[in-house]
Design a protein with these regions (language model features):
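Feature responds to low-complexity, polar/acidic, surface-exposed segments characteristic
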Residues: 2-36, 47-64, 72-97, 109-124, ...
Length: 138
């Protein structure tokens, strides 16, 4: 879920204390297990929510969303390439640069040589694998 993904990233970053707990999201309850993670992710620009007032913590994440969160966690670096090996993404997709970056960093090779499957649900196992590969590079 989006809450789990935020928590995974927050923990991978060392559980930094957010500057505050004031969020625009009405669906992140004070004291919830994911509140600090979402606050941190929001402050870092990793997520802006699904609307101005909702985070949608129980919504599943897609592969496109997960690599975008991870890419933003790294400061949204420009990928080295501008051409994707994946035929199922367009350069106008919000996750385009994130998917290029993740592929270049060996975080993901896609679901085949030519498919990234950006709209496929990203499982907990896949999220942890992406994080493991990302952290192995550091």
């Amino acid at each position: 879920t989006r809450a789990q993904n935020a928590a995974f990233l927050w923990r991978a970053a060392g559980c930094p204390e957010p500057k505050g707990t004031k969020l625009p999201f009405t669906d992140v309850p004070a004291g919830s297990w994911f509140e600090k993670a979402v606050c941190w992710a929001y402050e870092q620009g990793i997520t802006a929510g699904t609307t101005k007032t909702t985070f949608s913590p129980d919504t599943t994440c897609t592969r496109g969303q997960v690599v975008t969160f991870l890419w933003r966690m790294h400061g949204s670096p420009e990928p080295n390439s501008t051409k994707s090996p994946f035929t199922d993404i367009k350069n106008s997709d919000y996750f385009y640069k994130a998917s290029l970056w993740a592929q270049e960093q060996d975080i993901t090779a896609g679901t085949s040589k030519t498919a990234f499957s950006p709209n496929m649900t990203c499982t907990r196992g896949q999220i942890v694998t992406f994080l493991y590969r990302d952290m192995a590079e550091e």
